[in-house]
Amino acid sequence: MDRIILFNDSFQNWKSHQIPCAQLILTDLPYQLGDKMYGSNPVWYEGGDNSNGESKFAHKAAFDTDDKRGFRIPEFFHFCAKLLKPEPKGTKEAGCMILFCALEQFEELKHYAALAGFPNSIPFIFRKSYSAQVLKANMRPVGNYECALLFYRDKLPKFRNDGRMVFQNMDWIQDTVKYPKIHPTQKPVALLEFLIKTFTDVDDVVIDCCAGSGTTLLAAGNLNRKAYGFEIKKEFVKGFYDQLFPLIQPDMFSQEEKATKDEQIKQGYFL
């Protein structure tokens, strides 16, 4: 099987694709904002000016599954429990899920995650130097952050921090390379690379259940991880293969790291 594949299918059909279980499930969940997606964003109006009238984005969802009918959280966790690799006997090797989500979704996600066998969670807050809520700037404090929740079963997940502290509250990591924007809520590749590098090793499997443009797969490919994604919208899948897939550049340092570790295992450094 190829190392990087974006399936034009629902993650609920994962069995038919015969993919391996994941060390890390990394997904940007639908925030279920519906027609309020662009509510405080200048794009609501033509040219960002309300005197010009509403634009085509007014009262429009980012995509037609961004509501509670189009995306069911209990079903999502039911399938994720099967997609993530089983709890290992040893320590420091357990898998985990990292889900980008809205702050308002925290309690609902934690509830259904616990029911699916993931009672433990760690929140992340990513600080931005800007806010998309420009229209509310003279009315109230505006949001300049994004959130994520890390879920795990019992044992703490694999953690490769290279001896450095990883803060739960950190700066939003921007791309230094200009990547094509294919999806309205596309996350920076550099941020995804940081998370993948921290919670997986070379050749581990990363799965994105709601892949959108496929930047998770691009980030995983750059780091020599195997990655599989699911996306039901054909235009996003086509955009990934046409524009992002050709940009994957495997990191030679990661390959050397893997070769060194393999040799150390042969010599008995790891039990």
Indicate where each model-derived feature is located.
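Class I S-adenosyl-L-methionine
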Residues: 17-24, 35-48, 81, 96, ...
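SAM-dependent methyltransferase catalytic-core segment centered on the flexible catalytic loop
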Residues: 18-95
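Conserved SAM/SAH-binding loop
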Residues: 8-13
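A conditional alpha-helix N-cap/helix-loop micro-motif detector
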Residues: 7, 69-73, 185
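Short, conserved active-site loop motifs that form the nucleotide-linked donor/cofactor pocket
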Residues: 3-4
